[in-house]
Curated annotation (Swiss-Prot):
Pfam families: KH_dom-like (PF14714), MMR_HSR1 (PF01926). SUPFAM superfamilies: P-loop containing nucleoside triphosphate hydrolases. Gene3D superfamilies: 3.30.300.20, P-loop containing nucleotide triphosphate hydrolases. GTP 1 binds at residues 10-17, 57-61, 119-122. GTP 2 binds at residues 182-189, 229-233, 294-297. NCBIfam families: GTPase_EngA, small_GTP. GTPase that plays an essential role in the late steps of ribosome biogenesis. Associates with the 50S ribosomal subunit. It comes from Geobacillus sp. (strain WCH70). This is GTPase Der. Residues 352-436 form the KH-like domain.
Length: 436
């Protein structure tokens, strides 16, 4: 089950972005630790009392030169489409405006839970201003102050009460779940159709967090697979065309529910910055990754074309150096027969466990080959390493002082682990801890 989505909706200048930043806090910059990966500020992950959720700020959308009420209406409709819970924000100092009433009408039709937040109630004397807003028909309004941060706890408590209860896992453990992500026109839908071929497709309406997330289940060579959110690849209404950023949110939710992510590139168009961002989402999420170059039939080739394209990919995505690359054509079916075996291999690597004694033989050999670094006259000592998790494989290495573990030495250890055990297609995490 994915984390729920909360959208902040309201007319311009009611303080949506301020509240967004208040709720998100410091988390907005965390994602920028990954080299070459930046994230649009329109949405972020957030947490309140152990409830993790995505927060989207509809005010971050620029819908162009449309009249103001049309823009507000479009933003509200996008939020309704994507969100599990909606924070409807109004400005307490302005009273109820015609634009507020317009948004309220749309939200009433949505059947989504709505929590009404009255912003700019900056001191207790102003609380009486909230009573006019009962007329909007959303029950008790919550007084908040974006500038002071007051009232947010009560507001988030009310929001969290509407979160769906966490159920059991949607699919059996041995089912391989994968998704295809990529910018528009890279051929995701045609790839899905080519993978499925003429087989009878069992479309199961598994409730994701959106009403229209449809997963496609099929069996190939005795292995059950699920392509996550095939509906998301086909759904492109007018609003989505004008607000491309929202397809990112759908991709994030699909990634979260997948074991393996296929990052799809368009061979004809080459690699652009947006591809890098999209690939970064899969890497950050710790999923298995395969880079799929589609439309390979459409470009003129000589004996160097494939090698040069592969080098370009490695240059653009240094953080995905573990991901295999496959060149395919959904149209001519070129190399498509190799895709599912690759998905299966990466899924197995993503869930692989290594015995502690075998792992430590590799680590001790690595240290003998390349002694540990020193800092200010102190040398890093490695006592032992153990694997603590899978999906992705996560290792804890016990040392005398974690501060002495330089990232380049950590990288060296990761490469030795990969040389010994494979792990193609999956990120590896190494955490240095002091020995108690």
């Amino acid at each position: 089950m994915t984390n729920p989505v909360v959208a902040i909706v309201g007319r311009p200048n009611v303080g949506k972005s301020t509240i967004f930043n208040r709720i998100v806090g410091e988390r907005i910059s965390i994602v920028e630790d990954v080299p070459g990966v930046t994230r649009d500020r329109i949405y972020s992950s957030a947490e309140w009392l152990n409830h993790k959720f995505y927060l989207i700020d509809t005010g971050g959308i620029d819908i162009g030169d449309e009249p103001l009420l049309v823009q507000i209406r479009q933003q509200a409709e996008i939020a309704i489409d994507e969100a599990d819970v909606i924070i409807f924000m109004v400005n307490g100092r302005d009273g109820v405006t015609a634009a507020d009433e317009e948004v309220a009408k749309i939200l009433h039709r949505s059947n989504k839970p709505v929590v009404l937040a009255v912003n700019k109630i900056d001191n207790p004397e102003m609380r009486d201003l909230i009573y006019d807003f009962y007329a909007l028909g959303f029950g008790d309004p919550y007084p908040i102050s974006g500038s002071h941060g007051t009232g947010l706890g009560d507001l988030l408590d009310a929001v969290a009460r509407h979160f769906p209860k966490r159920g059991q896992e949607e699919y059996e453990e041995d089912v391989i779940k994968f998704c295809l992500i990529g910018r528009p026109n890279v051929g995701k839908s045609s790839l899905v159709n080519a993978i499925l071929g003429e087989e009878r497709v069992i479309v199961s309406d598994i409730a994701g967090t959106t009403r229209d997330a449809v997963d496609t289940t099929f069996v190939r060579e005795g292995q059950e697979y699920v392509i996550i959110d095939t509906a998301g690849m086909r759904k492109r209404g007018k609003i989505y065309e004008s607000t491309e950023k929202y397809s990112v949110l759908r991709a994030l939710k699909a990634i979260e529910r997948s074991d393996v992510v296929l990052v799809v590139l368009n061979a004809e168009e080459g690699i652009i910055e947006q591809d890098k961002k999209i690939a970064g989402y899969a890497h950050e999420a710790g999923r298995g990754v395969i880079i799929v170059v589609n439309k390979w039939d459409a470009i003129e080739k000589d004996d160097k074309t494939l090698i040069e394209f592969e080098r370009k990919i490695r240059d653009h995505f240094p953080f995905l150096d573990y991901a295999p690359i496959i060149f395919v054509s959904a149209k001519t079916k070129q190399r498509l027969h190799k895709l599912l075996p690759l998905v299966r291999m990466v899924s197995e690597n993503h869930a692989m466990r290594v015995q502690t004694n075998v792992l430590n033989e590799v680590i001790m050999d690595a240290v003998a080959m390349n002694p540990t670094p020193t800092h200010n006259g102190r040398r890093l000592k490695i006592y032992y390493m153990t694997q603590v998790a899978v999906k992705p494989p996560t290792f804890v290495v016990f040392v005398n002082d974690p501060e002495l573990m330089h990232f380049s030495y950590e990288r060296f250890l990761e490469n030795r682990i990969r040389d010994a055990f494979g792990f193609e297609g999956t990120p590896i995490k190494i955490i240095a801890r002091p020995r108690k």
